Amino acid sequence: MLKLFRYLKKAYVPVIAIVLLLILQASCDLTLPTFTSNIVNVGIQQKGIEDAVPDVMREETFLALKSLMKQDDADDMEDAYKLYTKDQVKDSKYKDYKDGRLYVRRYISKKDREYLDTSMSKAMLKLSAQMVKQIQANSQAAASLSKSQKKMMAQMKNMDTKDMPDTIISQAAISFVTSEYKAIGLDIDQMQTHYLLVTGAKMIGLAFLIMAAAVSVTLLSARLAAKLSRILREKVFEKVMSFTNSEFDKFSTASLITRSTNDIQQIQMFMTMLFRIVVYAPLMGIGGIFKVLTTNAKMTWTIAIGVIAIMLVIFVLFKVAMPKFKILQKLIDRLNLVTREILTGLSVIRAFSTEKHEEERFDKANMDLMKTNLFVNRAMTFMMPTMMLIMNGLTVLIVYAGASNIDAGKMQVGDLMAFIQYAMQIIMAFLFISMVSIMMPRAQVAAERVNEILDMEVMIKDPEEPKEFLPEKKGEVEFKNVYFCYPDADEAVLHNISFTAPAGKTTAFIGSTGSGKSTLINLIPRFFDVSRGSILVDGVDIRDVKQHDLCEKIGYVPQKGVLFSGTIESNLKYGKEDATIDEVKRAARIAQATDFIEEKEEKYDSPIAQGGSNVSGGQKQRLSIARAIAKDPEIYIFDDSFSALDYKTDVKLRSELQKETNGSTTLIVAQRISTILHADQIIVLDEGNIVGKGTHEELLNTCPVYQQIAKSQLSEDDLKKAREVSDHE
């Protein structure tokens, strides 16, 4: 999988942008629970009062607190506040206070405020305890208190600040500040509303920021993944185009199609998720753990239980689903293979009435794929409800454990809510990672299959220092002691093949089925490389020149005509894109294709369906021959290309071909002797060996194998005339 990232080397800018946006999104997500906690703790419970450092105090309160503090703490408080005289109070926002002077807080740093909050909270608690004693000493005032107020005052009187939890001290201090604000005449409800509105606005701003970051990451991830899939398809296509028959034999056509479409699609989907989650999930997990530790470290055991439960579920899914993902890809290959075979051989299936058998084959492949898909989908379906059960169970466990802390005054309700949200973020981080982990096996299998193509060592390569063809030997083909053995085969199919095909002459190859004719001819365009010996074109070993330069010299017509979707003109121009319409028409005339082309309504602009399925076999073959002629090459290779033509068309075509292309070298593989009667040189093959070489007349007298072929195809009169011509010569 990591090998595929090398194709994104130039895309580092969007990758960096994705990472930065994910960091921003994670930071905002981790901040939201803090605001939720503040709304509950500060906005609702504390009436919008954030800490025990009041904005303003009465002079008597200030002096009372100062007397209860250590000298250093008292000095710090003195520095933090400024005394307002009565006249200054009248001109300030505290003008409603008429009873004396006020101490107003100056601007202080966050660090100094936190330190002052601790010292002032304790002083306020002590001052509250003194006030309790005064109330209890006043029997009339004490009698007016409710039972709950009396109980609270008794607790405050007897409790030492050293034994009290920080939350109790903080809440008592906040109550003191609230009473102080009321005494000054401040509107507590307005303060609370203002705090809630400001905090809510901040949360909305964060939510929009999260949304913008998430949308941007999604767009960038989708573009990067799409770019990677495009590059992979290009690389796979380029690699497959460089394959020889040897490499093609290692992959079925259906498998190559699946790898270049479905497998790359799997990689694209995984990459889209990977870019979004691979950075985000760890940030959320680590950040959530840090936040939990700062909120209440004693309750982290609840999260540990949830994480362990999730890891167990993921482990089980991995053990169960991983092998099935590998099987799934092979079954897709199998289904594609069966489908392709059925569609390709539909006419044969109907002719032999084997529709039922093919239906059973297809049903088996289809059912195997369906069963495996159902198994995988059931496993994936099991994951989400299990995860939700774990998350909901964890929430209940946290509430149960947090309730006792709240009851003991060790935790506030808002902190519990924040703890639950952080716990869910940690669990979601592991859930995201598990989703990536679950998709990874299938993507990993797909990546391995794509890499099998990309890493395939091509046997036929261009030389590092290519040579040029010799111009004085234009079109000459020479075989020197050539042996050839198919890859992984034990025996050679060609043995010590040596001959020269002179430039501008016709050399034909004939022999029984399996004698090696097509194999020999396919060595010239380097569909395979010789095992021993050498093949020279224009006096240069074909392994020493570029494959492109070699193929530029060759006009190749395969046994089975192959056409591409487009038009007749685009197919005939396939080997020479800049061919003029006159050159195209000339090629069609030589190939005896003009008549059926002119009969069509759109003539040369007539559409050709995929694989040439809308033309007959003979028409397809003539268009394939015309395509090679339009290229006007130095060397023509006809690999049994005339067998699909009727005898009359065959004769006309070869006659025109001989007249119009007499300057080119022509190599013909034939089954019919009538096709090669007038060849300048006929080479007879038998079991991979040359057993005869000469003209038709010469071989009738000297080659037994050729004689057998001739007797099976020609009449006695034809044979007699040939012998008479030979004797006369």
Please provide the spans of the model-predicted regions:
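Hydrophobic alpha-helical transmembrane bundles that constitute the permease/transmembrane domains
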Residues: A11, I23-T31, I204-V215, I267-F270, ...
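An intracellular "coupling" helix at the cytosolic face of ABC transporter transmembrane type-1 domains
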Residues: Y12, N245-S246, N262-M271, F275, ...
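ABC-type nucleotide-binding domain
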Residues: V15-I16, D51, K66-Q71, Y84-Y97, ...
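Membrane-embedded alpha-helical segments of multi-pass transporters/permeases
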Residues: L30, T34, V215, L219, ...
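Short intracellular "coupling" helices and adjacent cytoplasmic loop segments at the cytosolic face
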Residues: I44-D51, R58-F62, K70, A142, ...
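Conserved catalytic Walker-motif region of ABC-type ATPase nucleotide-binding domains
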Residues: V240, F362, V450, F479-N481, ...
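Helix-loop-helix
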Residues: K291-I308, I314, F375-E448, I453-L454
